[in-house]
């Protein structure tokens, strides 16, 4: 078993809801100690369906709390439509484990059809998605991870959940994102 303090420092990223007509989306990062103490909230704008969310995530992680952050959580691999977070690049540039948490196993066939229909660079995006580890079921969620082993992932998820099935940093980023709905 991997030993880890209860207040392990993590950051979780999600995007705010967006409309079809939007060209820009909002990325939310919540930095927490364990599952109870919020020590930072970060925002970045990124292009809907672009390919810039990876650099935005890296920029946030490398800010004030960089040395303290032990894990980067992502609420999926796509943000703002099909802006794909490159797990390998995030891990390489930050030297931190990256853990993707999702509710359901993704329907890759459906995703790839949409990419081929709407994107000139669909092959590049599909290749990137296919390079990631397959999602695996862990209790009642699915996870993909880079830069960590399964035991570490199980342990850090357990330490960062409160009453939800997902880590608090992701839950709070999601809640903050929903707050942007009122601004429309």
UniProtKB/Swiss-Prot annotation:
InterPro entries: Endo_dU
Domain of life assignment: Archaea
HAMAP family: UPF0215 (MF_00582)
Family under the similarity heading: Belongs to the UPF0215 family.
Protein name as catalogued: UPF0215 protein MJ1150
